[in-house]
Design a protein with these regions (language model features):
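Alpha/beta-hydrolase superfamily serine-hydrolase fold, recognizing
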Residues: 2-176
Length: 176
């Protein structure tokens, strides 16, 4: 645990940097086990330490609960391990990695040296672009995304909150 948030630490050889990984799953499924192979592979391939963060899931935990877990774990990880930190995640986890990077500016400066966002949900306009072109994609439809948003938010998505949707931030300066 880091900051009281369940986490799993992977270590292998030289520890030049730390990767803090947030799993995907639409904020409703996933955890330390579902993404164990990904985190182990990142550690084995890069030699970096990897911490997998097991944030609370909806509907039991609604926004900002999952963000608070990610932020609390990040703060404890940053305090425990000096050096470079790369924030990473897939899907919902990519959202959390980006949200933590935005929120860290002015709070924990200079530690985050990169973001690896794998098909992240960042809060784009669902009325245009690939949201329209791929609205009925076989793996994840726009209707699925709307469902996850309603469950994650407890039925009321926040307006313009970059902790919820990082693209709602008005300042992208100082981000890795």
């Amino acid at each position: 645990q880091f900051g009281g948030v369940p986490c799993r630490l992977y270590e292998n050889g030289a520890m030049a940097a730390m990767v803090v990984y947030h799993h995907g799953g639409g904020f409703v499924v996933g955890g330390l086990e579902s993404h164990d192979d990904i985190c182990a592979e990142i550690c084995a391939t890069t030699g970096y330490r990897v911490v997998s963060v097991d944030y609370g899931l909806a509907p039991e935990v609604v926004f900002p609960g999952c963000f608070n877990d990610a932020w609390t774990a990040f703060g404890a990880i940053a305090a425990a391990f000096p050096g470079r930190i790369v924030l990473a995640g897939d899907s919902a986890g990519g959202n959390l990695a980006a949200a933590v990077a935005h929120y860290a500016r002015g709070r924990i400066d200079g530690r985050i040296t990169g973001q690896v966002l794998i098909y992240p949900g960042l809060g784009g306009d669902r009325g245009q672009g690939s949201y329209v072109t791929h609205a009925t994609a076989p793996q994840l439809t726009v209707a699925d995304m709307e469902f996850y948003q309603q469950v994650r938010s407890g039925g009321t998505p926040p307006e313009r909150d970059p902790r919820y949707a990082p693209l709602h931030d008005t300042d992208f300066s100082g981000l890795p």
